[in-house]
């Protein structure tokens, strides 16, 4: 019970932090978009695409590797193994981080000239390169804190990092954005660099303090595993993840380069292409993915829990956890999807004053259950040691995505990109879920997990819409934004009520959740 309650409190902490950071991030994105315009947002997204590949190279699967091996050492109560694992993991992070830094720094002119086709991106790329070793080290140490179940330390640094990033962004944009697009991009890059360097240094300091408090340094005559043996175990985890990440990130970067080019072939101007790309990728998608922060925290914490159960061959416990994850993820995601579809126009026009953004939110919202469930499934597969399979699925996903973008966008414009997102998300989720069900022998309950929540959210949003049409004057005193909040909250309450009445939420589930708090 102590482990169960510890998992709950850590999950609640990470959920709160994730929701806070995602809320602040979306709010900041709204402000930034209003300051620099859709074209600059599009160029920034292209830079982020290249930076994303560089970060992937710097990380090379180290967070998962550190989490899994430290969790394995804790499960076996093997302190010398943990000590050697951490030495190898930090070395891994620094080597790959420095290599990625040099590649991006010296390759920036070629990337800016021939890939992004915009030399205004060069300073931003070089600033981003300097931060890569710090990002890699921070990822490694975050994996350590997840494994030892002290995520509140890394969570606190994440909050401070985001506050620093946004504060610097707003400060620098006020002074630099008026000098043109290049200066605005430079302000964004400098802000991120300051925050990333702070995060890496702060996490390393916390790690040193945590090691001193909780893990004694092995004596000089203690028998330690060799660097070679631990390094091989670490690479056996990180390399499959890294190779998949390289391929997927490289293909995604290529995909993001092809999208504006495809829109130009469809008939858009260069500026309009960047603006349309920015509207979908940096405005609509963040809103759709925002509620996923609530589940993302749980998914990350599942890896060490499932890893320890897998090492101990506790198959019944694994199936029990997986059943709970599937049930609660779909209950939450279907509700979010239905409410977002029902109020997409209000969300788009309120956040961005853009009907185009509202339309893209409506089109992408039906994918929310697939996206969120795929994320949770991926975490459970990694906990079961199935990272090689995940690698194959991710490469297939990214390859089909690039091919679809190349073929569809010149003919269908932005709708071609929407179709691409649907095809790849459905394929990735299907392959991952089928694999997890096969290896865990878990039996899905379609009626309870899917049909009942779907019926509940349709009833809840329809009734809310009907009441709003019948008595719109009752919401006039709270204003337009306040009315949207009231409508969404009312829909959530009705969804919860219908879910209980129709059996999507059962007494056994309520007792299970209550047991975390009551200690029974």
Predicted regions and their residues:
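Membrane-interface junctions at transmembrane-helix termini in multi-pass inner-membrane proteins
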Residues: 135-157, 366-396, 407
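Hydrophobic alpha-helical transmembrane segments
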Residues: 157-171, 179-212, 396-400, 414-435, ...
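Helix-loop junctions and terminal segments of transmembrane helices
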Residues: 60-75, 288-313, 319-322
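Membrane-proximal transmembrane or re-entrant/amphipathic helices at the cytosolic face
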Residues: 466-520
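N-terminal membrane topogenesis motif
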Residues: 1-24, 80, 84, 221-248, ...
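Interfacial segments at transmembrane-helix termini and the short loops linking adjacent helices
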Residues: 109-128, 340-371
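Signature of the first transmembrane helix
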Residues: 6-67, 94, 101, 105, ...
């Amino acid at each position: 019970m102590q482990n169960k309650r510890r998992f709950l409190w850590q999950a609640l902490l990470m959920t709160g932090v994730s929701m806070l950071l995602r809320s602040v991030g979306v709010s900041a994105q709204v402000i930034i978009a209003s300051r620099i315009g859709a074209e600059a947002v599009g160029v920034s997204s292209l830079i982020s695409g290249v930076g994303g590949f560089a970060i992937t190279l710097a990380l090379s699967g180290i967070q998962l590797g550190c989490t899994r091996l430290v969790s394995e050492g804790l499960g076996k109560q093997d302190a010398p193994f943990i000590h050697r694992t951490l030495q190898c993991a930090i070395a891994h992070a620094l080597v790959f981080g420095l290599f990625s830094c040099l590649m991006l720094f010296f390759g920036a002119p070629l990337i800016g000239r021939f890939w992004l086709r915009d030399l205004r991106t060069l300073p931003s790329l070089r600033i981003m390169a300097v931060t890569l070793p710090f990002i890699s080290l921070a990822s490694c140490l975050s994996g350590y804190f997840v494994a030892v179940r002290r995520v509140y330390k890394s969570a606190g640094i994440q909050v401070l990092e985001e506050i620093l990033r946004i504060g610097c962004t707003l400060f620098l944009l006020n002074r630099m954005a008026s000098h043109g697009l290049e200066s605005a991009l430079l302000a964004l890059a400098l802000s991120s660099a300051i925050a990333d360097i702070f995060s890496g240094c702060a996490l390393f300091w916390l790690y040193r303090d945590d090691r001193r408090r909780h893990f004694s340094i092995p004596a000089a005559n203690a028998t330690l595993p060799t660097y070679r043996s631990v390094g091989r175990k670490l690479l056996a985890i990180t390399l499959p993840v890294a190779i998949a990440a390289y391929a997927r990130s490289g293909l995604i970067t290529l995909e993001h380069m092809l999208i504006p080019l495809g829109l130009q072939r469809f008939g858009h101007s260069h500026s309009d292409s960047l603006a349309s790309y920015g509207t979908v990728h940096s405005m609509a998608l963040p809103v759709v993915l925002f509620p996923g922060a609530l589940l993302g925290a749980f998914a990350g914490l599942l890896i060490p829990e499932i890893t320890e159960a897998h090492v101990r061959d506790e198959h019944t416990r694994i199936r029990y956890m997986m059943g709970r994850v599937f049930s609660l993820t779909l209950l939450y995601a279907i509700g979010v999807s239905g409410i977002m579809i029902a109020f997409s126009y209000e969300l788009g026009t309120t956040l961005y004053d853009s009907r185009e953004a509202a339309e893209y939110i409506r089109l992408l919202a039906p994918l929310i259950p697939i996206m969120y469930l795929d994320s949770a499934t991926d975490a459970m597969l990694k906990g079961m040691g199935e990272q090689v399979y995940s690698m194959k699925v991710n490469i297939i996903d990214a390859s089909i995505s690039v091919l679809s973008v190349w073929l569809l966008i010149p003919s269908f414009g932005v709708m071609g990109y929407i179709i691409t997102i649907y095809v790849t998300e459905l394929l990735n989720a299907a392959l991952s879920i089928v694999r997890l069900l096969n290896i865990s022998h878990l039996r899905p309950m379609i009626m309870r997990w899917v049909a009942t929540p779907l019926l509940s959210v349709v009833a809840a949003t329809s009734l809310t819409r009907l009441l709003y049409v019948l008595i719109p004057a009752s919401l006039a005193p709270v204003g337009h934004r306040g009315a949207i909040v009231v409508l969404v909250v009312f829909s959530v309450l009705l969804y919860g009520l219908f879910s209980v009445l129709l059996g999507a939420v059962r007494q056994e589930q309520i007792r299970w959740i209550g047991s975390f708090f009551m200690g029974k």
